Structures are given as C-alpha cells and as structure tokens.
C-alpha cells in the first residue's frame, strides 16, 4: 500500500526526523499509522506516534481504537507490510523486523481483514 506520509515528505527529511527521534527518545518507536485507502473505517486524526518500545501490538491497537472512537463491537485490523502482526508482539520487535529504510515503522489499519495474511510468532 502506498503511504500518503511518504508521498508528502521526501525521504531525506523522513530519515533525518526518524534519526533525531531515536536519538532523543531511545526507548520509543517512531510510527506512522494510516488508514487502508478503501476501508470504510474512520480516518485517524494524527498519523505520527512515538510509541514506547515495550508496548504490545494489542495495546497499540487499543490506542488506535480510542483515537478513531471505534465502538467495541466493531473490528479493527492493523497491518505491517500487509501482514497482521501477533497481538502479543512487542512494538520494538515489530520495529526491528519491519522498519522502513527511512527509520519509521509504517502501520496501516482497516475495518476488515484486507490482506488476509497472518504473521506467526
């Protein structure tokens, strides 16, 4: 999936920003979170997050649910490289495995399981 954030900000600027963030906040992960384009789920109010390294994927999903004011009965799926990461995985391990060459971790979310793949822990 194409990232609007990548389209709007040149690579060098993104890379410099991610490096600055990692130097200043070594225990945090720079994350860009965007909605899957064709999803009918609400659009999030901010794309950039500074996530504690010891946060789990499940806890991050909870943060996203709160930001988009998603009701409990509605489903949300998050994807990293078009794969559903394990809920219990730490954001730090997801970051190490999937960070972009610019230093950000790109996460997309949807109201439906758009891609269908699961990552095994």
From Swiss-Prot:
Which Pfam families does the record match to this protein?
A: ATG8
State the UniProt keywords alphabetically. Autophagy, Cytoplasmic vesicle, Lipoprotein, Membrane, Protein transport, Transport, Ubl conjugation pathway, Vacuole
Q: How does it sit in the membrane?
A: Lipid-anchor
Query: What biological-process GO terms show up in the record?
Result: autophagy; protein transport
Site residues by UniProt (Cleavage): 116-117
- Describe the processing and modification events after translation: The C-terminal 5 residues may be removed to expose Gly-116 at the C-terminus. The C-terminal Gly is then amidated with phosphatidylethanolamine by an activating system similar to that for ubiquitin.
Q: Where in the cell is it found?
A: Cytoplasmic vesicle, Autophagosome membrane; Vacuole membrane
**Entry-linked InterPro entries:** Atg8-like, Ubiquitin-like_domsf
**Positions of the pro-segment in this chain:** 117-121
What phenotype has been reported when the gene encoding this protein is knocked out? Increases the rate of incompatibility cell death.
- Give residues with lipid attachment (Phosphatidylethanolamine amidated glycine): 116
Induction record:
Expression is positively regulated by idi-4.
Recorded GO cellular component terms are: autophagosome membrane; cytoplasmic vesicle
Give the family from UniProt: Belongs to the ATG8 family.
Q: What does this protein do?
A: Ubiquitin-like modifier involved in autophagosome formation. With ATG4, mediates the delivery of the autophagosomes to the vacuole via the microtubule cytoskeleton. Required for selective autophagic degradation of the nucleus (nucleophagy) as well as for mitophagy which contributes to regulate mitochondrial quantity and quality by eliminating the mitochondria to a basal level to fulfill cellular energy requirements and preventing excess ROS production. Participates also in membrane fusion events that take place in the early secretory pathway.
Check the record and name the PANTHER family matching this protein.
MICROTUBULE-ASSOCIATED PROTEINS 1A/1B LIGHT CHAIN 3-RELATED (PTHR10969)
> In its UniProt entry, what is this protein called?
Autophagy-related protein 8
